[in-house]
């Protein structure tokens, strides 16, 4: 199952100083709500990504708490202003404790 | 219980739309929208944005989708269908079966070898003595050329490979052939399309040929074209095949669906594809 979960990010590789850039993220994930029943009538256990955080050079710049009503394959995007070059680190946390990560450098010229 | 739906409500909604249409035909002045142009599709024809999604009077399901759904399809990053294409790309070079081969061993670069292939399917396949669609064709290569077991219909690897092969034809016009050995199967598919079925006694054509542009419950009825398939469907919260869609449309009128991959649905697939000849492939599309 875990092998099916893949994070994807789209971040511009370069930006002008103080330019506002759009960051897009998507993680393939079933987001099982814990509300559904299987064909035997048994509850399918909840398994969602419950948190997503982004840090720029170690400093938090974005954080989202995700709830069970969010669709499969959650897509999140936000805007960011960078005044210096650095690394963006993305972290998704799963109910089962797994943590998925992605990283990309941005060069600010 | 988010999946619970009332079949009675759905039935009532469908009957209501067909019923109200009958009334409109009788007295066009009753409906302002109808009186305006007499045609619910006029707004789409008039929108230059949709030119690329039309071929003459044929309109892709994209045209009928909400702006939010369209935006999801437009951006490959946002389009969750691209995840299936990625799965397929990985499957493409996976060695499986007794012959020790992957798809790539024989077909090399899919961007070259598979370009334009999917838009000509379903087609008559001599090895089956009947039609094959892309899923069947992939499984033929698995059993014959790779000595590997067939992939299960709607399984992740088969959906992925289908998406990957179909994606190589994105932007190319659907161009199925219905003459020669395909002709009798095409006729079967056409018969299916015009046959009333289910407790509601409604044929495909009554919804998708006679009433596109009308509302049915919360849905905007499209022409029921297949150029976007396989598709990421928001209602399914997953990627799915055209035959899965057929199954849903049969259930919509409370008819017993046929199995996915069956001859009935494959013949129907050829008829539906032919109706859309000239529309450009959008694989993978996003639909509600």
What would you call each of these model-derived segments?
Chain B
Residues 100-111, 161, 189, 199-211, ...:
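The canonical Cys-X-X-Cys-His
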Residues 89, 95, 163-215:
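Surface-exposed interaction/gating patches
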Residues 1-11:
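Bacterial N-terminal signal peptides that target proteins for export
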Residues 98-104, 217-220:
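Extended intrinsically disordered, low-complexity coil regions enriched in Ser, Thr, Gly, Ala
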Residues 80, 86-92, 100-105:
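Long, well-ordered hydrophobic secondary-structure segments characteristic of membrane-embedded
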Residues 114-121, 216-222:
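Short cysteine/histidine-rich zinc-coordinating motifs and their immediately flanking basic loops
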Residues 12-15, 19-84, 112, 122-187, ...:
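Post-cleavage N-terminal segment of exported redox proteins
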Residues 205-232, 236-239:
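An amphipathic alpha-helical core segment
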């Amino acid at each position: 199952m875990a092998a099916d979960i893949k994070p994807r990010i789209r971040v511009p590789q370069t930006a002008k100083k103080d330019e506002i850039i759009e960051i897009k993220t998507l993680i393939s994930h079933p987001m099982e709500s814990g509300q559904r029943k299987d064909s035997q009538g048994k509850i399918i256990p909840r398994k969602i990504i419950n948190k997503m955080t982004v840090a720029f050079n170690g400093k938090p710049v974005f954080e989202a708490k995700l709830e069970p009503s969010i669709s499969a394959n959650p897509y999140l995007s936000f805007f960011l202003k960078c005044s210096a070059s650095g690394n963006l680190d993305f972290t998704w946390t799963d109910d089962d404790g797994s943590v998925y990560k992605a990283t990309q450098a941005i060069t600010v010229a | 219980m988010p999946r619970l739906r009332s079949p009675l409500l759905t039935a009532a909604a469908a009957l209501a739309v067909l019923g109200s249409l009958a009334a409109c035909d009788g007295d066009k002045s009753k409906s302002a929208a109808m009186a305006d142009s007499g045609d619910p599709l006029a707004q789409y024809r008039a929108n230059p944005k949709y030119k690329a999604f039309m071929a003459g009077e044929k309109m892709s399901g994209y045209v009928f989708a909400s702006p939010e759904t369209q935006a999801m399809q437009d951006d490959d990053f946002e389009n969750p269908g691209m995840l299936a294409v990625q799965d397929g790309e990985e499957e493409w070079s996976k060695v499986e079966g007794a012959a020790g081969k992957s798809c790539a061993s024989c077909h090399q670069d899919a961007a070259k070898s598979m370009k334009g292939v999917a838009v000509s399917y379903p087609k008559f396949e001599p090895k089956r003595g009947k039609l094959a669609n892309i899923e069947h064709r992939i499984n033929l290569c698995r059993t014959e050329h790779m000595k590997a077991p067939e992939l299960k219909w709607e399984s992740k690897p088969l959906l992925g490979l289908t998406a990957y092969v179909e994606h190589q034809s994105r932007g190319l016009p659907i161009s199925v052939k219905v003459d020669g050995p395909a002709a009798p199967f095409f006729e079967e598919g056409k018969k299916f399309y015009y046959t009333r079925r289910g407790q509601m006694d409604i044929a495909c054509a009554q919804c998708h040929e006679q009433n596109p542009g009308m509302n049915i419950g919360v849905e905007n009825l499209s022409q029921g074209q297949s150029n976007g398939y396989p598709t990421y469907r928001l209602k399914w919260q997953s990627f799915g095949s055209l035959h899965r869609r057929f199954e849903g449309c049969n259930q919509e009128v409370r008819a017993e669906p046929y199995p996915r991959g069956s001859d009935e649905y494959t013949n129907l697939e050829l008829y539906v594809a032919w109706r859309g000849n000239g529309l450009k492939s959008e694989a993978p599309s996003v639909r509600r």
